[in-house]
Amino acid sequence: EGQPTIDAVADNVTETTRGTVLSKNGVKVSTVEHGMAALYALGIDNCLIQVNGPEFPILDGSAQYYVQEIERVGTVEQNAVKDFYIIKSKIEFRDETTGSSIMLGRKRK
């Protein structure tokens, strides 16, 4: 209690130069991408992670240790409705400033 909370949503991503930085109300935490990758790989979409510093530990540069620790401590199934978004047609998003783009389409076989 009394500790700032930063939601891991795209609107809170403020930097991606040397790692992903999440910021909110003047508070920021960096190198969250390895922890986020572990959560995604394990199908976890709702959790609270407490960080005691300005960044997530980089460890070996992968999500492996995060996955191992999450599996070690376990997870709790929540009794809540989960929203799903189904993309029915091809979508392309392009950021003209960075030149990056995201294209969603059919699965490749």
Where are these regions (language model features)?
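Short acidic-hydrophobic catalytic motif
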Residues: 1-109
